[in-house]
């Protein structure tokens, strides 16, 4: 899997040795609000019928995911044979209603997607699409992605170089427009460093936003992290440090509406050194 792009958007140091035991503290300020929303009958049916197979219960232990994914050190026999350990593994943080997630998973059937979302209708909507499209490469944890990362996903370890995440997707996180709420933005230095520590060397963090001040903050924070490098600054200097939109990320209905109103969209793709 790579982050090569086709459509432009608007304008190694030693690895961090963070382990879940060192990250047991969770941020006091959450970056999301649990929205109230009605789960439709179709979404509820998808949860009942497909949830037992595709939803992984939150368990604050690295062994819980390792037992499912050989990419994280689990036995290959539990995940479809030895070839499963060679499949790319992507963490998606906050998938909304799952439109982009389902599109990308369908486009990349040989890649596994571990997707976190706290909004119940969104979980139901993605499960519904999994059933309709016959997808098999998505698993969902209906829990705060930061707690999942801190307690269930180990940092990359040079002693097991093939284990770890190949990519992390963070598309359109809440921009928290008001200045007094900026501290709630998800993309902050400490979190980015912990995300980067879980990528394999060469893996990448792909962020997208339609709020320019947040795009500028992302570019600064990602650029300051010693584990990450911005290859787009060299390959597409005309974009000012942003990346062309990778071909795999679709235009969602929300994004199309924004573009129709003249709003910009900024992609950022930073690779692990």
Regions found by a protein language model. Give the residues of each.
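Conserved class I S-adenosyl-L-methionine
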Residues: 180-181, 208-224
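A short acidic, Gly/Pro-enriched loop at the edge of an enzyme's catalytic core
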Residues: 151-167
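SAM cofactor-binding core of SAM-dependent methyltransferases
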Residues: 85-150
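A short glycine-rich, Lys/Arg-flanked "PGG" loop and its adjoining helix->strand segment in the class I
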Residues: 187-201
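A short SAM/SAH-binding and catalytic strip from SAM-dependent methyltransferases
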Residues: 166-185
